[in-house]
A protein has these predicted regions:
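Aromatic-lined ligand-binding clefts that engage carbohydrates, nucleic acids, or primary amines
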Residues: 274-288, 316, 386-409, 416-417, ...
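Glycine/proline-rich low-complexity spacer/linker segments in large multi-domain proteins
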Residues: 321-352, 446-470
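Aromatic- and carboxylate-lined catalytic core of secreted/periplasmic carbohydrate-active enzymes
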Residues: 179-233
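Edge strands and adjacent loops of beta-rich recognition modules
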Residues: 232-265, 358-382
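The substrate-binding groove and active-site-proximal loops of carbohydrate-active enzymes
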Residues: 1-4, 30-49, 86-93, 118-136, ...
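Active-site neighborhood of glycoside hydrolase catalytic domains
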Residues: 2-81
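A cross-kingdom feature marking solvent-exposed beta-strand/loop segments within repeated
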Residues: 175-176, 180-184, 198, 250-254, ...
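Catalytic-core region of carbohydrate-active enzymes that cleave or remodel glycosidic bonds
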Residues: 61, 92-190, 194, 205
Length: 470
């Protein structure tokens, strides 16, 4: 699989190597593999090394001519470094330690490089937005320059995880820590491409007589009111989807679906009550009995069960969201989504006649043929239009909403969630047009029937409301 991927990659970039006059000066075969090795002590170190050596050999055999390098925390070189590839230390601010560890794993010599120098940090939903003072970033930059250490800012511009592209981490307190839609990162250049005080501090440090002027901001607009004129219950869309029938709930992968949502449905011919256990939830679910909301279950908060009462001839519905795939550490290979283990009620495994409805939301839902049917505490799609005389970047204000995604002119601009700290969604002006524009919002919780939406001129990325997600 890696060889097939690398072959396609090589064919696209082979002429872009510096040896052929292009911009590619080095190639990294793995990213922070040492972190994975450290967490997978059940696998012998020599087996890990065989894997990473094979990866670099494939790259070499294809014809890459530029130097290879690895990228790990300085304390993880034992698992990540590889002979023939320059070891670089992510996030290492101690010059002496950097040189010591690189010398140890690179035949007593440099060059010395920090492949990931963090001027900020990524953020997860329901957690504080990390920041770093401009003077701290500038001071560390000067320290590297004074000691002839090469470095790469990660990130200089973070940007946005549009659509379903955001990843995730995990820790002891949370089985998943989904990344926010915004990847602003408190980087020198903001999510919307603005120069920040941090950028100006670095520019002052690095500028020469030939440094060009800072570009002007892209035009910014505010949309004071977007009327939402149609509300459609997600069940109405589900009714037009052919279900997959199985004895047990199927994962996203078994359903050949990568992103979005799956609606799991089970009809009961006999009543049952007790504790509903969904230990295999990946990642977020709202549970309904006969259309009435019973509970929210959530992998971030490790909430996997609730009390439930299913009467005679009732229907249990569980709408599950994939909140993003873990992309760091040993759990990168445990990334199935949906319901991945049995559903249990009152100690009884629930099998037989499960229905799965695939809702990947890979395209903006077409609500033209549907009548208004949205209700409070039901998964609901909202549609509206707005007219612009001019276009520009803007930020949709989602502070009054619960959890969901937004499409504008057919483009999924990302997830929102009331827990924060992100409360706005960046909407680039290039996706807007003069005249009529269309918006569709899928609101999963729908605790209030919404009538309108607005956009504002500045982002809100530090408004944390974690209690709203519990």
């Amino acid at each position: 699989a890696t060889k097939a991927y690398f072959t396609q990659l090589y064919n696209q970039v082979k002429d872009l190597q510096i040896t052929k006059g292009g911009p590619i000066i080095m190639v990294q075969g793995e990213n922070e593999f040492g972190s994975y090795v450290a967490q997978r002590k059940d696998v012998p170190l020599e087996e890990h090394k065989k894997y990473s050596a094979a990866v670099f050999q494939q790259l070499k055999d294809l014809g890459f001519e530029v130097p290879f390098f690895t990228s790990d925390g300085s304390w993880l070189f034992e698992g990540g470094a590889l002979p023939g590839a320059l070891p670089t230390a992510n996030g290492e601010s101690d010059i002496a330690k950097l040189k010591e560890v690189v010398n140890k794993f690179n035949n007593g010599q440099g060059p010395y490089m920090v492949a990931e120098f963090y001027p900020g940090w990524l953020d997860h939903w329901a957690e504080p937005f990390p920041t770093q003072k401009p003077e701290q970033t500038a001071r560390q930059t000067k320290k590297y320059l004074d000691n002839k250490v090469s470095f790469n800012y990660y990130m200089v511009h973070g940007g946005t995880n549009f659509g379903f592209t955001s990843g995730a981490n995990y820790d002891k307190e949370h089985d998943i820590q989904p990344d926010m839609t915004s990847y602003d990162y408190d980087a020198p250049i903001s999510e919307a491409g603005w120069a920040t005080p941090k950028y100006n501090a670095l520019r002052e440090l690095l500028k020469t007589s030939e440094t060009p002027a800072v570009p002007e901001k892209m035009p910014i607009i505010e949309i004071p009111k977007i009327a939402l004129t149609k509300t459609v219950d997600l069940a109405d869309l589900k009714a037009k989807i052919s279900p997959v029938y199985e004895d047990t709930p199927q994962t996203f992968e078994q359903l050949n679906q990568g992103d979005g949502y799956v609606w799991y449905s089970k009809k009961f011919t006999q009543p049952i009550s007790g504790k509903l256990e969904l230990k295999g939830l990946r990642d977020y679910a709202i549970v309904y009995v006969n259309g009435k909301k019973v509970a929210e279950l959530n992998r971030y908060y490790k909430k996997y069960d609730c009390d439930i009462e299913v009467p005679f001839n009732a229907t249990l519905d569980i709408v599950v969201e994939n909140m993003g795939r873990i992309n760091y550490g040993s759990q990168i290979n445990e990334n199935n989504k949906g319901i991945i283990s049995p559903v249990i009620i009152n100690g009884q495994t629930i099998t037989g006649d499960w229905e799965m409805y695939k809702l990947p939301m890979s395209q903006e839902p077409d609500l033209t043929a549907y009548k208004n049917s949205g209700k409070v505490n039901r998964p609901t799609l909202y549609q509206g239009t707005f007219t612009l005389s001019k276009t520009g970047d803007t930020f949709l204000d989602m502070r009054d909403w619960g959890k969901g995604i937004v499409f504008v002119n057919g483009i999924n601009i990302g997830r929102y969630w009331s827990v924060g700290p992100q409360q706005t969604l960046y909407l680039p002006g290039c996706w807007l047009k003069k005249g009529k524009n269309n918006i569709v919002i899928f609101e999963q919780k729908n605790e209030t029937l919404q009538k309108e939406l607005k956009s504002i001129a500045t982002p809100i990325l530090e408004d944390l409301r974690p209690e709203k997600g519990q």
